Swiss-Prot record:
Catalyzes the stereoinversion of LL-2,6-diaminopimelate (L,L-DAP) to meso-diaminopimelate (meso-DAP), a precursor of L-lysine and an essential component of the bacterial peptidoglycan. This is Diaminopimelate epimerase. The keyword Protease does not apply. Substrate binds at N13, Q45, N65, G75, N76, N156, N190, E208, R209, G218, S219. Homodimer. Pathway: Amino-acid biosynthesis; L-lysine biosynthesis via DAP pathway; DL-2,6-diaminopimelate from LL-2,6-diaminopimelate: step 1/1. Its main location: cytoplasm. PROSITE patterns: DAP_EPIMERASE. The record marks H158, E208 as: Could be important to modulate the pK values of the two catalytic cysteine residues. Its EC number is 5.1.1.7. Keywords: Amino-acid biosynthesis, Cytoplasm, Isomerase, Lysine biosynthesis. It holds the Pfam family DAP_epimerase. InterPro entries: DAP_epimerase_AS (IPR018510), DAP_epimerase_DapF (IPR001653).
């Protein structure tokens, strides 16, 4: 019942990558909550690797938040999966089956991993939201100084609020939970505040659905880059500066979003998928 795992850092995003391909047991809610409660294994997302069910993909991944809920996308977690796969000599580029569809990733250098997150979705009915919205670029929703969100789905839904103030001075820990659970979002929402610093860069902070305030969120970085371009604030190729570091985002002419950034190995070992107990080992 030993499942190989790694604790990794995806630009401040705390990620566990677990290889479930040979496991006879699924990861239980008890195990997820136990790992989240342990200071050494506390995580934002768990990325579990499985054999693919589609011939177009090399592997299948599932994504778990720290509260035990499932996510459809996690850009930084996906970059950590790509790093794990390449470190184990399983290839240099991969097509991964995810809850949001098949996405592609590859190692650029020893430290930099790129992931093609696919195309953003601006269709309100597919996000989903609870009321009809004519223009997802400007949505009337307010919390304190935050208003007029831009809604973008990158497999999971993001609300981006652009502000002129220093984003560090806005108490996102206060407004994030309120907006995440707003009745507009029947499946909850990721909440970000962004400040454009030039036509080539912006600063970003994110309250992540199911995880809370986080140092980095890859899909939020992608969503903010797309939102800024839609509003005419930036060009297609920008740097997104997060508390954990910088991600390079390219919103290509073919509508695909490519995210590039570093990953870091913290420790590895084997875990029990039923209980969440683990033993450190070099893995």
């Amino acid at each position: 019942m030993k499942t190989p795992f790694r604790k990794m850092d995806g630009l401040g995003n705390q990620i566990i990558v677990a290889d479930m391909r040979e496991s006879t047991h699924a990861l239980t809610p008890q195990a997820i909550l136990a790992l989240a409660a342990d200071p050494q294994t506390h995580f934002d997302q768990i990325m579990t690797i499985h054999s693919s069910t589609q011939k177009e993909a090399d592997f299948r991944i599932e994504i778990w938040n720290a509260d035990g809920s499932m996510a459809k996308a996690c850009g930084n977690g996906t970059r950590c999966v790509i790093a794990w796969l390449t470190d184990h000599n399983l290839g240099e580029s991969f097509r991964l089956e995810t809850p949001a569809g098949i996405i592609e990733g590859k190692r650029q250098t020893d430290n930099l991993i790129s992931v093609d997150m696919g195309c953003p979705n601006f269709n309100a009915k597919e996000m989903p939201v609870s009321r009809e919205i004519a223009d997802t670029n400007y949505v009337k929703i307010t919390a304190g100084p935050l208003k007029d969100a831009c809604l973008v789905s990158i497999g999971n839904l993001h609300a981006i609020f652009f502000v002129e103030d220093n984003i560090q001075q806005i108490p996102l820990e206060k407004y994030g939970p309120k907006l995440e659970h707003d009745p507009l979002f029947p499946e909850r929402c990721n909440i970000s505040i962004a400040s454009v610093t030039s036509h080539k860069s912006l600063n970003l902070r994110t309250w992540e659905r199911g995880a809370g305030l986080t140092k980095a969120c890859g899909s939020a970085a992608c969503a903010s880059a797309v939102a800024a371009y839609r509003r005419g604030l930036t060009q297609r190729h920008i740097d997104v500066n997060l508390p954990g570091g910088t991600l390079n985002i390219v919103y290509r002419e073919d509508n695909h979003i490519v995210m590039t950034g570093p990953t870091k190995y913290e420790f590895g070992g084997f875990l029990n998928p039923l209980t969440g107990t683990y033993k450190k080992d070099h893995f």
